[in-house]
Regions:
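Conserved C-terminal helix/tail region of periplasmic/extracytoplasmic solute-binding proteins
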Residues: 159, 165, 360-361, 377-425
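Hinge/lid segment of periplasmic solute-binding proteins
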Residues: 98-150, 176, 190, 202-205, ...
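C-terminal lobe and pocket-closing loops
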Residues: 272-289, 300-400
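Extracytoplasmic "Venus flytrap"/periplasmic binding protein-like
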Residues: 54-125, 134, 160-162, 167-170, ...
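Conserved N-terminal structural module of periplasmic/extracytoplasmic solute-binding proteins
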Residues: 2-5, 9-17, 26-104, 165, ...
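Structural recognition of the beta-strand scaffold that forms the well-ordered cores
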Residues: 37-40, 69-71, 93-96, 141-143, ...
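Periplasmic solute-binding protein
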Residues: 105-109, 129-167, 195-219, 308-317, ...
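Glycine-centered hinge/linker elements that transmit conformational signals in sensory
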Residues: 176-181, 220-249
Length: 425
């Protein structure tokens, strides 16, 4: 009895010791893990949530010593919340940003410079992918995915108008002539889809057109709203509206299903257009490429095309105490072949910033007429936007003037003067 009891006690003691040791090992492993926070709106939107969650899970599997804590914030709120968190000394480690928000955050001084840590990655990025992401010579954001605007054209509509469907307009003069032919031959078709709403995105979208006319109403090297170039742009926009070449007041997204239904001839829009068209009309890739094409913006007097970047960026914060892990995650999101296939192309319908890849499957996915045109021809034409603390106010003033130009008969000189008056406040 004594021997049995002693043996039982020894067994219990051994089991207890094993449990304690196991718990200690597990606790030690947990303590060895680094947890980083990732503020983003990708998890806030149903269209992208599954993709980003899958990519985060794959990153954690490949990096078992790092946990990613996703912080969901809506697109409309993320910039404001990040500024507040920088000021309170409690920012996330990494955040998803876009457009003017990137420069607003940089202006706080709260972003970690990336020039050194990202040097090897930057060496394999496409020319033009860093446009607008450097402040005082320092890289403040890593391009995550790219969605610049291109000049889409409907070959079937062009052919009906007697135009060469394989030769889209290369200059503003050629564009004007093509718009006239399309309107005369197909009066129910919208010749050109452009965003003329009064919002910040609309200024971003119209900025390349302004540059085509040599206009720089605001920003670095601004020549003002009363310049001859800005008046020429406003006059051109009025002419398009008066002749019925554009449909005023529509957001750019409203034209996407219409071009899929052969109701829009030319569309100034991003790379995601192909996905929208094929989802709408169920076209095969082969039929799509026979029916649609994309190229660079028609040039003005300077003979140069322009575009704008509508993609997303990743930033790291100075107050992060886990910069090594944060960078590893950022680099994974932007450059890992699996992440690119799953999220960038699969869910976000955009392009990766990387110039080359050794992944054969990814090479095949990227080797399409549309992706090649964007990567090789359009991305190099991306022009910096007039981003800064006053961008939103400037957008309101400028686009209000554009709207007045396309909807009223008020003299262009007066409209330009009104824009300038608001910009000077």
């Amino acid at each position: 009895m004594f021997r049995k009891t002693a043996f039982g006690r020894a067994a219990v003691l051994a089991a207890s010791t094993a449990i304690v040791l196991g718990a200690a090992v597990m606790g030690s492993a947990a303590q060895d893990k680094t947890t980083i926070t990732f503020a983003n709106w990708a998890t806030a939107e149903a269209a992208t949530r599954p993709g980003i969650e899958e990519v985060i899970a794959n990153f954690e599997k490949a990096n078992p010593d790092i946990d990613v804590q996703s912080e969901t914030i809506s697109f409309s709120e993320i910039a404001r919340q990040l500024v507040l968190r920088i000021r309170s000394g409690n920012p996330p480690d990494v955040a998803q940003v876009a457009g003017n928000d990137t420069l607003l955050l940089a202006a706080t001084g709260g972003l970690e410079p990336l020039s050194t840590i990202a040097a090897d990655t930057v060496a394999n990025l496409k020319p033009g992918s860093l446009s607008g992401l450097e402040v005082d010579g320092s890289l403040v954001a890593l391009p995550w995915n790219q969605a610049p605007a291109g000049f889409w054209y409907n070959k079937a509509i062009m052919e009906k108008a007697g135009l060469d469907p394989e030769n889209p307009p290369k200059t503003i003069d050629e564009l004007n002539a093509a718009l006239k032919s399309i309107k005369e031959s197909q009066p129910d078709v919208i010749p050109l889809g452009v965003d003329t709403t009064n919002r910040a995105f609309s200024l971003s979208s119209n900025w390349p057109w302004m540059l085509t006319f040599g206009a720089k109403p605001v920003g670095a090297d601004a020549t003002g709203a009363e310049s001859a170039e800005m008046k020429a742009y406003l006059t051109w926009m009025r002419d398009l509206a008066e002749k019925g070449y554009i449909e005023v007041g529509r957001k750019i997204g409203e034209f996407r299903p219409l071009i899929a239904q052969d109701k829009v001839a030319f569309l100034w829009d991003q790379v995601l257009v192909q996905g929208v068209i094929q989802t709408t009309n169920k076209m095969s890739d082969e039929d799509f490429y026979k029916h649609y094409g994309v190229t660079v913006m028609p040039t003005g007097a300077a003979g140069k095309s322009f575009s704008f970047e509508g993609g997303h960026q990743l930033v790291m914060f100075k107050d992060s105490e886990k910069k090594e892990a944060a960078w590893k995650f950022m680099n994974f999101l932007a450059t890992d072949p699996g992440a690119i296939k799953t999220y960038t192309i699969g869910y976000n319908r955009s392009l990766p910033p990387v110039a080359q890849t050794d992944d054969e499957e990814l090479k095949k996915l990227l080797d399409t007429p549309v992706f090649n045109t964007y990567s090789n021809d359009i991305i190099p034409t991306i022009a910096p936007q007039p981003y800064g603390p006053q961008f939103a106010a400037a957008a309101t003033a400028i686009m209000a003037g554009v709207q007045e130009a396309v909807t009223s008969s008020r003299p262009i000189d007066e409209i330009a003067a009104s824009i300038q008056q608001q910009l000077s406040r």
